[in-house]
Regions:
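AMP-forming adenylation/ATP pyrophosphatase catalytic core
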Residues: 128-134, 140-366
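ATP-dependent adenylation/nucleotidyltransferase module used to activate substrates
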Residues: 1-155, 182, 257, 364
């Protein structure tokens, strides 16, 4: 009796090659497509670039992949659950002036919880996804492709959820995955990577968010001088470190968002990428998920996806909180994830609650 593996088939090349590799290894492979977003049900009218529902296009591609591989494809809808567990969190955080990462919560509540339960109903011994990550024993390791490593997004997935999980492409680079897809004539071999919000797709961000949150105009303040230099159109449209599309088209100097105050609806900017107002040296991290029993004092941290690792000193607090100290971290942003590594191993991850400089709360980050 072959071991049955249910693969999350998204309609993209990574999940397609994952299914291919598992089939080559002799597993009984079954595809399962999740539809987690419905533009009609969710009143999603603004921001769709081509007028075509991307979720149905993805399902078409998923079906073509499974037909090519001669494996069955099932479909499940988690539209309500995604809205309640992931998207409402996303909107709530935006309203607080923070910068959330919905992909992290999607993994926690949908891909490695509801999906796994649905796979078990299909008789799965294991599940697999197209994440660039590796599991060795009970350790979560970075994917071999440093540019594509997705352990950052897996940082809120529990050790229990990671049991019976396979990451078939974690040992490959993206070019190697593309090469395999072309070699075996997979219909999505040349499909471009998705870069939008998890399961929603690529959108004009501000237009998309305007479906659900109405931005309130407010002042843009030069943090150095305290002078008003412009007007913003809703704090949810900006993130710390942002340079483009701030709304100061007549200003020839390079300006960066360095702070947001949701109480006064104020956006703060600083000039120059090396501005001291973009720097911090300490952060309080909440809702920490411990993926390992290792609790080192010295490690490295990633404060946003694809950012460079930063050496940190860690203090372990009560209530699943940690305090991390570092040297001149740039654009460390409340609401984003802080993920801790020891070499290749992902140890833990939590949400940045508060940021400090020289032992003081940063006043323009409220």
């Amino acid at each position: 009796m072959f071991m049955k593996v249910v693969v999350g088939i998204s309609g993209g090349v990574d999940s397609a090659v994952s299914a291919l590799l598992l089939k080559q290894e002799g597993y009984d492979v079954v595809g399962l497509f999740m539809k987690n977003w419905d533009s009609n049900i969710n009143n999603d009218k603004e921001g769709i670039t081509d007028g075509v529902c991307p979720q149905e296009l993805d399902y078409r591609d998923a079906k073509a992949v499974c037909d090519e591989l001669c494996i069955p494809l099932y479909r499940v809808d988690f539209i309500k659950e995604y809205w309640n567990d992931v998207f409402k969190y996303f909107l709530d955080e935006l309203e607080k002036g923070r910068t959330p990462n919905p992909d992290i919560m999607c993994n926690k509540y949908i891909k490695f919880d509801l999906f796994k339960k649905e796979a078990k109903k299909l008789g799965a011994d294991k599940i697999a996804t197209g994440h660039y990550a590796r599991i060795k024993g009970n350790r979560l390791l970075r994917g071999v492709d440093n540019n594509k490593d997705q352990t950052y997004f897996l940082s809120q997935v529990s050790t229990e959820q990671l049991k019976d999980v396979l990451f078939p492409i974690g040992h490959l680079t993206k070019p190697e995955v593309r090469k395999l897809a072309k070699e075996y004539n997979l219909p999505v071999a040349d499909k471009k990577d998705s870069t939008g919000i998890c399961f929603i797709g690529e959108r004009h961000y501000q237009q998309f968010v305007s479906n659900y949150l109405k931005g309130k105009d407010g002042d843009i303040i030069d943090v150095e001088t305290g002078k008003k230099v412009g007007t913003h159109h809703g704090l949810m449209n900006y993130t710390i470190g942002q340079r483009r599309n701030v709304g100061l088209s007549g200003d020839q100097k390079r300006h960066y968002v360095c702070g947001k105050d949701s109480k006064t609806n104020t956006l703060y900017i600083a000039y120059g990428s090396d501005s001291k107002y973009l720097l911090s040296d300490e952060a309080l991290i909440e809702n920490v998920n411990f993926i390992s029993d290792k609790h080192p004092t010295f490690a490295t941290a990633k404060f946003r996806y694809r950012s460079e690792d930063v050496p940190v000193t860690i203090e372990y607090l009560e209530n699943n909180q940690i305090r991390v100290k570092y040297v001149d971290g740039k654009a460390v942003t409340p609401g984003q994830a802080c993920v801790i590594y020891l070499g290749e191993q992902c140890l833990m991850g939590g949400i940045i609650k508060q940021v400090f400089k020289d032992g003081k709360d940063i006043w323009y980050l409220k």
